[in-house]
């Protein structure tokens, strides 16, 4: 296994709570991005005290109640399966606060997205209806995007969070692009994590992470609930026929701006009629 591919941990940390993924600065090459995926059983309560990190809690599947201080967001979440392809609810929580997540349905799958808290901001419910929806690409390069925390949002100080759906036979994050240089307005420096789900679950997709000089060049067969770390470089995704892909992206860097640079060898595909 390469250093960028993370298989599910499936580590039961408490009754009714299982860590599927746990990516942080201590166990990865990332300096700005953190990610946890937890699976919860009904009635289980997960609590976390944030220090210098802010967090976006995404109700991937099932219903949850999120509490922080006097803020209580009860039974949020819109879908039983991410492949319903409808937006879901999320909650943003700033650094220095303690929050709880309680599972309200028999099963709940929750994503915890982290980055540096650059300033104190109010705890905010990001409703499913607040997500902007985009259809991007053409030919075999089509995908559906749900923007949870885009760079135009003022809810967070550093976090960027987005969901992407790619149907079988298509590529996404394509043509290959990168955002690893602090060179605005042309390109921003953003680390990224990918959390993948696949339908049906026995499938796999391919993801390559590479730099211009190929000092980093990993191509991975990525399975259901795997995560991929992108500290730098281009990072395209290819989805085999017969399977659909979902991934949740978390991005963060020194500036909260998403400006990417396409691989010049492959940018020509954008010029087709």
Curated annotation (Swiss-Prot):
One GO process term, biological-process aspect: inositol catabolic process
HAMAP family xrefs: IolB
Record field: catalytic activity: 5-deoxy-D-glucuronate = 5-dehydro-2-deoxy-D-gluconate
Keywords: Isomerase
Enzyme Commission number(s) from the entry: 5.3.1.30
Endpoints of the signal sequence: none
Pathway membership, UniProt: Polyol metabolism; myo-inositol degradation into acetyl-CoA; acetyl-CoA from myo-inositol: step 4/7
GO MF term (any one): glucuronate isomerase activity
Gene expressing this chain: iolB
Enzyme kind, highest EC tier: isomerase
Keyword Isomerase: yes
Full protein name: 5-deoxy-glucuronate isomerase
NCBIfam families listed in its UniProt record: myo_inos_iolB
Function recorded in the entry: Involved in the isomerization of 5-deoxy-glucuronate (5DG) to 5-dehydro-2-deoxy-D-gluconate (DKG or 2-deoxy-5-keto-D-gluconate).
InterPro entries given in the database record: Deoxy-glucuronate_isom_IolB, IolB_Bacilli, KduI/IolB_isomerase, RmlC-like_jellyroll, RmlC_Cupin_sf
Family: Belongs to the isomerase IolB family.
């Amino acid at each position: 296994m390469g250093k960028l591919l993370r298989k599910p941990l499936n580590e039961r940390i408490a009754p009714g709570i299982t860590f599927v993924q746990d990516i942080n600065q201590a166990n990865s090459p990332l300096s700005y991005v953190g990610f946890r995926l937890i699976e919860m059983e009904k009635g289980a309560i997960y609590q976390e005290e944030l220090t210098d990190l802010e967090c976006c809690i995404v109700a991937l599947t099932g219903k949850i109640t999120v509490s922080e201080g006097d803020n209580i967001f009860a039974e949020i979440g819109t879908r039983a399966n991410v492949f319903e392809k409808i937006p879901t609810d999320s909650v943003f929580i700033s650094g220095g606060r303690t929050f709880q997540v309680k599972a309200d349905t028999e099963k709940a799958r929750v994503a915890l997205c982290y980055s540096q808290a650059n300033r104190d901001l109010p705890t905010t419910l990001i409703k499913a209806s607040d997500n902007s929806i985009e259809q991007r690409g053409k030919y075999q390069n089509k995908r559906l995007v749900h923007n949870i925390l885009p760079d135009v949002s003022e809810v967070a100080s550093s976090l960027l969070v987005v969901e992407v759906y790619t149907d079988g036979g298509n590529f996404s994050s394509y043509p290959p692009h990168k955002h690893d240089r602090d060179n605005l307005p042309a390109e921003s420096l953003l680390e990224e994590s990918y959390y993948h789900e696949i339908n049906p679950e026995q499938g796999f997709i391919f993801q390559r992470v590479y730099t211009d000089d190929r000092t980093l060049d990993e191509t991975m067969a990525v399975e259901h609930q795997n995560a991929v770390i992108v500290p730098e470089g281009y990072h395209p995704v290819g989805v085999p026929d017969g399977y659909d892909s979902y991934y949740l992206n978390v991005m963060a860097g020194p500036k909260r701006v998403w400006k990417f640079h396409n691989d010049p060898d492959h940018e020509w595909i954008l010029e087709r009629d």
